[in-house]
Amino acid sequence: MEQNNLIEQFQKLEPLVVATADYELQMRLQQLRDTYGTMLRYMVQGMDDPNASRIYNDLVSQAHVLGDRAERVLRIQKQSSDRYVITYKTLRAEVSLSDMVGKLRNYNEALRLLRDEPNERENIQQHDVEQHQRGREEMLLMLFGRVWTSDVWSKSEQETALSMLMDDVVFTEDKCVLISATTLALQEMFDERKLMLLFDAYLLPELELSQRALVGMMIALRQHNERIKQQPEVQSRFSLLCDDANFVRDTFRVFMQMQYSRLTDTVSEKMRSDIIPTILQSTKFKQTQFGIEELDDYLTQNGENPEWFKNRMADTRAQAKIQEMGEMLMEGADVYMSTFSQMKNNVFFQQIAHWFYPFSADLPAVADILGRLGGETSSVFGAMLRYAPFCDSDKFSFTFMLSMIGVQGQEGLSKSLTGSLSHDELSEMLETKKTKKRAADISRQYIFDLYRFFTLYPFHQQFQNPFNKELPQFTPLAHDVFQPLLNNYDEVLSLAEFFMRKGVYQEAIDLFEHLLPQKVEEDVDLWQKIGFCEQKQGRLEEAFESYKTAYDLNPNSQWTLKHLASVSFQGEWYSEAEVYYQLLLDDDPDNLRYLRRKAGCLMKQNLFDEAIPLLYKALYLDENSVEDQNNLAWCQLHEGQFDKARELYGKVLSTHADQPSAHFNLACTYLAEGNIQQAYPLFREAYLMQSVSDDGDAQFVRDFNEAFDELQPVSNMDNERGQALLDAVRLGI
């Protein structure tokens, strides 16, 4: 179908439509064939129809829709265990969408009246409220199921849904559920009218509705990119929205938030294995033992209690991890997934619709629990549910957890939450009403809700997961429908930088390159960032060229110069790297890293005599550096300065006798001098220390042969004697 070959489409559709035994679908297929036949007859008769192209595209689109509808009918007929089919079959066909919306509106209106009217008989009023709440809940579940499992909408159904969104009587929470049901329905099959409803919902003044609609819209557009190529009205509507700076900003933010949610597994693993264990080690969490035995021994000898220091160290580390967790949360990471993922077994979550409910204390399942809490405890948890940065799904989980831990557990948890607050701070928290959420918070937390559904719902495998890592990344370059967004330089740049920070380097490069960097000084940053991403990918030659372009445009950038030197060294272009490290040393002559890197470049080029002064200077700056001593001794060996090399290697051995390399390096000095008698025991000791590892013998042979080959120019030992010495060392002669 994607090739837009109508004859082939009709031939493929026929057995599918016939299998449904649905007369309406069969007649629809015949109508499409007849229309196409009429169009072809006009063409062969030489009649020029200016609408031919539009009619053809419309036929292609309708053929797609017919295929979707036929597949849906067959699914309902044959897949009885599918949650979609089960939900569809439990709904009464004679109850229309309009009827459901009308009844739901009546419940909403009654609840508003009961809340606003003073009633002396409070018990009767409360009974009425509960009765209407349960009726509202039942109707909302039916509405969700009807919309999710619906066929393509008629014009009247679209108008009914839109009227519900525009109705001031209907609660915002109920409208949110309608938007989520529409989003889920679009995952099952493309429906232009449902997609248009999301466009309309984005324009509503309530942020809870507009942001939820935007997320659903982006998921649907991404999934149905190919279909939308035959939908000029959808393309036109999206392009029109792209003229709105607020829409563009919101859309790019959702791209980042959706992309970040793909990293939730990584974030959860860090929370489980690093952040939470470290925080729990703090004395504030009654943890006192950390197994720092060396510190224990040292402090005990001096008479101090080691627990004092352990607790202080643990508190410091915990504070750092709490700060890190806060920074992750501020950036948009889903840090609570690992905590609440174990709390989705409540019967409440057996209903698909409940995964998409905005949290509300009025829901019967929640009201029953919160109503049984004590006075201050109830206030504390109520405030927490207002302030905590939890998504709605996690707020439900938290509430259900309260019902399981009992009164004592509730009081203990309440005290732990408020223990660090002063009386005034606690009073302010309890008295402050719910603050208005920002658009970014609403969309992020809704995306968290979606992520939980598509990964934790028991039958989640029956749904197309938009967070699946096998799908393209969340970038406007991945789908044609998002092309109008690419005209916004600053937003594209921000998204590219986001991808770069998150290690999604190819998409970052593509976005940077879309900005068409020119060889002018104003674009130096772009060339630097492209080079950085290319270097991270291991594309060293391309990274070098990007860095070189940036350097030519601005030779005063130390950052560019450092990366030019680094990528040259990494690419083993040592002569170029030497030049760049010297330029860095000209500006910072005592920089140890630059001294060592330049010396390394010279050694790789066998310019040992030029490397020696650099290594002497490095040792002067860091006299205890074993690395510099070994490198200097190696250069001296190659220059025939055997006494100096032996002295340095001997010094290293005296302080690092437990390291095989210390014995091996000194043995090489004697090997270069041809003194096998002195070399053998040192080689043998290195071999015995190294051979305990699995690959120790093979690694020693590789090291010996490499050293032997490198020392050949200054050694008189031939290959046969070298092999004999190696065999003797391995056999322990």
Predicted regions and their residues:
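Conserved structural position within tetratricopeptide repeats
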Residues: 514-517, 548-552, 582-586, 616-620, ...
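TPR alpha-solenoid repeat register
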Residues: 213, 491, 525-526, 560, ...
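Alpha-solenoid helical-repeat scaffolds
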Residues: 354-559, 563
